[in-house]
A protein has these predicted regions:
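DNA-binding alpha-helical recognition surfaces that contact promoter or target DNA
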Residues: 19
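Bulky hydrophobic/aromatic content
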Residues: 22-110
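Generic beta-strand structural signal
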Residues: 34-36, 126, 136, 226-227
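Short, positively charged loop/turn segments that connect secondary-structure elements
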Residues: 2-16
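General beta-strand recognition
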Residues: 42, 101, 132-134, 233, ...
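Residue-level signal for tight coil/turn positions that link beta-strands
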Residues: 36-38, 128, 148, 229, ...
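Polybasic (Lys/Arg-rich)
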Residues: 172-272
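Core beta-strand-centered patch of the WYL/Sm-like small regulatory domain
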Residues: 77-193, 202-203
Length: 272
């Protein structure tokens, strides 16, 4: 009886595991395979940034789940991103290729009435602790980026499928951008060379920007050209957009723009 229970229990665990693996494959598009040589299950593309972010979130969730109420020993950022409640319905609409209607306002005109926008959502983007959706604006007949924190209501238009073809290579739309600011019509990616001075001291509260940027690159195109005793020189290929300029300004005198000249001139003017 015990051996039969063990066999049945083992079969149940195996079926549960296979079902979970199937759900992960279908929902998150992550492939998990069994390594026969070690008899262990492995994620086949664990170097992918998307997979790494999911695993990081799972690590945090598992730690919190294992230890119960930790409010006395763990403190979270109080400035929580708004609009995350729309992630799930937008993701569902993306998967099912369905239109949704947004009730949307602009930050600089928040007192005015919300605008209604019917969109065909293609991609969700996180940047600087905010979420955005890249979508086809049906009324404007153009690609637009909408901040989820500016959505007041979302109506799920379940019966209406996409009427516009999904643009080719839409997943690469933000590749040349620092965050979610794209400005395709006027801005092209440029080569930017930056020198970050090394601080004489390095603390938890004031990290050395040169070392910090090795661990947390400014952009996926970042390359280290050279590292000297007093500075590190980085090269990027990126669109020079207002959010990128704001990021550079946050480093103050610790960053020097080597190229292009017009970026150096713009930063100098803003620092006065």
């Amino acid at each position: 009886k015990d051996s039969e229970d063990n066999v049945e229990g083992g079969d149940l665990l195996q079926r549960t595991l296979q079902r979970d693996i199937q759900v992960i494959r279908e929902v998150y598009n992550i492939e998990i395979k069994c390594n026969r040589s070690t008899n262990e299950y492995e994620i086949t593309e664990d170097n992918d940034l998307y997979v790494q972010n999911l695993l990081e979130a799972f690590d945090v969730f598992r730690a919190l789940q294992n230890y119960g109420n930790l409010s006395e020993v763990i403190q979270f950022e109080k400035r929580l991103p708004a609009g995350t409640e729309y992630l799930s319905p937008l993701l569902r609409a993306i998967k099912e290729k369905r239109q949704v209607k947004l009730h949307y306002y602009k930050f600089w005109d928040r007192s005015s009435q919300t605008q209604e926008r019917t969109i065909e959502p293609y991609l969700l983007k996180e940047a600087q602790r905010r979420w955005y959706v890249l979508a086809w604006d049906v009324e404007k007949e153009a690609l637009r980026v909408f901040g989820l924190d500016r959505i007041k209501r979302l109506d799920d238009e379940r019966g209406v499928k996409f009427q516009h073809p999904v643009p080719k290579d839409v997943e690469h739309y933000f590749d040349d951008s620092f965050g979610a600011w794209v400005d395709n019509e006027r801005t092209q990616a440029e080569e930017v060379v930056l020198a970050f001075r090394k601080l004489p001291t390095d603390t938890v509260f004031i990290p050395n920007p040169a070392k910090y940027l090795e661990a947390m690159p400014l952009h996926s195109s970042q390359q280290i050209l050279k590292e000297e005793e007093e500075a590190i020189v980085l090269r990027l290929r990126i669109k020079i957009t207002p959010d990128f300029i704001k990021e550079l300004l946050s480093y103050g005198k610790q960053v020097e723009i080597l190229t292009p000249a017009h970026l150096q001139e713009e930063l100098t003017a803003k620092q006065k």
